């Protein structure tokens, strides 16, 4: 008999809130409230909704670019405390760095992982 390993959680949001302050004001904007879900390794998920509903905010928190105001975000069962070199995503809008060539934009992720320039070229 072969035992199957339990599916590994790729990303998990547990009771996540995100608030943004308005410049020059004490008012806050609630971008995400009590978000709880998990995605298993190999699972495909689509986050859809109208403009301004918090889709990009979730991606930013999942990648560690933005910290949640409350709750926990985990990637590969580890709490996200800052930018994660193993996480990348592409937004709907093309956000290439215009001062870099197409190849240099593609190589950027490898550079962040410490891959030598000679390896990037191959």
Give the predicted meaning of each segment.
Residues 11, 30-32:
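Conserved structural motif at the start of ABC-family nucleotide-binding domains
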Residues 45-46, 89:
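Short beta-strand immediately N-terminal to the Walker A/P-loop
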Residues 48-50:
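The feature captures the beta-strand-to-loop junction immediately N-terminal to the Walker
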Residues 63:
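Helix-to-loop junction immediately C-terminal to a conserved catalytic motif
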Residues 69-72, 119:
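Conserved coupling/switch loops of ABC nucleotide-binding domains, chiefly the family-specific signature
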Residues 71-82:
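Conserved ABC transporter NBD signature motif
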Residues 86, 92, 101-103:
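Beta-to-alpha transition at the N-cap of a short helix in the ABC ATPase nucleotide-binding domain
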Residues 103-111, 121:
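Short helical segment in ABC ATPase nucleotide-binding domains corresponding to the A-loop/adjacent helical element
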């Amino acid at each position: 008999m072969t035992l199957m390993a339990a599916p590994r959680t790729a990303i998990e949001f547990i009771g996540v809130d995100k608030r943004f302050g308005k410049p020059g004001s004490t008012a806050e904007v609630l971008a995400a409230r009590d978000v709880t879900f998990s995605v298993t390794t190999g699972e495909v998920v689509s986050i859809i909704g109208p403009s301004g509903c918090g889709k990009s905010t979730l991606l930013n928190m999942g990648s560690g670019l933005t910290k949640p105001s409350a709750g926990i975000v985990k990637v590969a069962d580890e709490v996200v405390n800052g930018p994660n070199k193993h996480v990348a995503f592409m937004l709907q809008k093309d956000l290439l760095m215009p001062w870099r060539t197409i190849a240099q934009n593609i190589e950027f992720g490898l550079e962040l992982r410490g891959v030598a320039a000679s390896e990037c070229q191959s």
